[in-house]
Amino acid sequence: MSLSAETKAKILADFGRCENDTGSTEVQVALLTAQINHLQGHFKEHIHDHHSRRGLLRMVSARRKLSAYLKRTDVARYTAMIQKLGLRR
């Protein structure tokens, strides 16, 4: 259940610092957020899919750690990213 190439390209264009930016913290958090949102729809249909739920929890944890890193290093970029993604603090 990965994201389509078009979705990834749109996220890279929206959150990347330059044209070929694929590794900045904002891009990583945005990609994880898109995957998490995609999986939430999957779990509405497949309630007992515990194997995938474990992967979802790993993604949520990774997103939380990356967000904490960005907040620690550059608060302005962190707040802009949170507002753009519509995440809670």
From Swiss-Prot:
Signal sequence range: none
GO CC term (a single one): cytosolic small ribosomal subunit
GO biological process, one term: translation
GO molecular function, one term: rRNA binding
SMART domains: Ribosomal_S15 (SM01387)
UniProt keyword Isomerase present: no
Keyword annotations: Ribonucleoprotein, Ribosomal protein, RNA-binding, rRNA-binding
Pfam families from the UniProt entry: Ribosomal_S15
InterPro entries in the cross-refs: Ribosomal_uS15 (IPR000589), Ribosomal_uS15_bac-type (IPR005290), uS15_NS1_RNA-bd_sf (IPR009068)
Family that this chain belongs to: Belongs to the universal ribosomal protein uS15 family.
Task performed by this protein: One of the primary rRNA binding proteins, it binds directly to 16S rRNA where it helps nucleate assembly of the platform of the 30S subunit by binding and bridging several RNA helices of the 16S rRNA. Forms an intersubunit bridge (bridge B4) with the 23S rRNA of the 50S subunit in the ribosome.
Assembly behavior: Part of the 30S ribosomal subunit. Forms a bridge to the 50S subunit in the 70S ribosome, contacting the 23S rRNA.
Protein name, per record: Small ribosomal subunit protein uS15
Organism: Shewanella frigidimarina (strain NCIMB 400)
